[in-house]
Structure formats: C-alpha cells, structure tokens
C-alpha cells in the first residue's frame, strides 16, 4: 500500500511540474511576441493612414498599382492642403438643453408662462380632494351599467354625494367616520324610541334642557341623565376624531 501511495505521489508531482512548465512557457511566448511586435503608437498618425495593406504582403507587392507616396511628396498631408468640410464641423444632432436646470428656469421663464393656468393654489387642495372623491364614487356607480340600482340605493348615493359637497369631508376615511357616527346616533335614537321616556330623550337630542322634561315626569331623572351621557360621549368621540384627522393632515 505504501508503494502505491509513493508512486501516486511521484506521478502527481510530475504532472504538477509539467503543468507549471506549460504555463511558464506560454507566458514567455506571450512576452516575446509583445516585444517583437512593432509599436503602433510610436508611428505618426499620417503614416498609419497612408499605410498600404498590399505592401505588408510580399507576394502582393508586384500587383500593387502604386506605392504610398512619401510624407513630403503626398499632397494630402501638406499643412496648406488639408480639405475642410463645413458640413462635418456641424454636429449631427442639436445639443439638447436640460429641462429642469436652474439656468433654463431663470433665463427662459417665458416657457413656463403658458403652463400657469394648470397650476393650483394652496387653498384649492380641499376642493380638488372633494372633486376627486366625487368622481371616484360616480365612476364606481358607472362601472357596471347592467346592474339596476334600486330607488333606495340611488337615494343613499345621492345623499352621500350631497354630504361630500356640503361638508368638509376630503377623504374616504372621513366619510366612513361620518357614517359611523350617524349610525351610532341612529342606534341611540332607536333605543330611545323603544323606551318609555321618548320625549325626554328627544329633548336631549335637540339640545333642550332636561330640567323642562323633568318637570313633567320627575321619575325619569335617571334615564334622562343616562341618555344625556350617551349623547355627550358620542359627541366627544366625534370631536376627538375630527381633531385626530386634522392633526394627521397637518403632519402630512
């Protein structure tokens, strides 16, 4: 076993040495070719342009019509005979100026004058949001014309659009909060209609003093106070929601 390992080691070492010799030989050949190759950068540019491709091949030399003229005899390389083409001096494409550079804005401010009618003042943001909200709702209604809306659905939609136009609602979130508040108010009113103290609760909802209602029925003090607490809680919730909404838009 040791003899086999020793023989494998020798063969592996010999293969590695041969590989290194091949790499070294290829590097030496490449370096020699670079040294033997003529440097094109050392020659003048006019000699490179004047070089005849047939002159490089000895077999094609007899068939070449004319050899390259010397530098002093070739009129193409004279300092006073250089042809100048005016068309070549002009650029193929006009130089485009950047659209948002500071120089263009300052020097060519008249370009922006025709677009001033599209600018929107800072106070138009609320109206623009209302219009966009209204257009979104109208587009949702027109999305499926095959579906026939009932009269109640049309009335609800009309009420929502009127609410958008006549209130300070700007987003869907505010509209949802308004509807949630009205649903809660309707639920409280529904409970008041089922209660025996309907008139006292209704007086609280229309901001009348509960003392006037208590004069007619002193036994309804507890129920009236409970109803008043419910209404005040709902109003406080609405006020907190409005404050949070306005604070959110101020941050944005």
Curated annotation (Swiss-Prot):
> Which PANTHER family does this one have?
HYPOTHETICAL LOC498675 (PTHR36680:SF1)
The UniProt disruption phenotype note reads:
Male mice are infertile with smaller testis and epididymis, but female mice retain normal fertility. Spermatogenesis in the male mouse is arrested at the spermatocyte stage, and no sperm is found in the epididymis. Germ cells apoptosis is increased without changes to the serum concentration of testosterone, LH, and FSH or synapsis and recombination during meiosis.
Q: Phosphoserine (modified residue): where?
A: 195, 209
Keyword set for this entry?
Answer: Differentiation, Phosphoprotein, Spermatogenesis
Which Pfam families does the entry mention?
A: DUF4712
Task: Specify the species.
Answer: Mus musculus
Role: Essential for normal spermatogenesis and male fertility.
Q: Which GO terms describe its biological process?
A: cell differentiation; spermatogenesis
Name under which the protein is recorded: Uncharacterized protein C3orf62 homolog
Q: Does the keyword Ligase apply?
A: no
Tissue expression summary: Testis-specific. Highly expressed in spermatocytes (at protein level).
Q: Which domain of life is it from?
A: Eukaryota
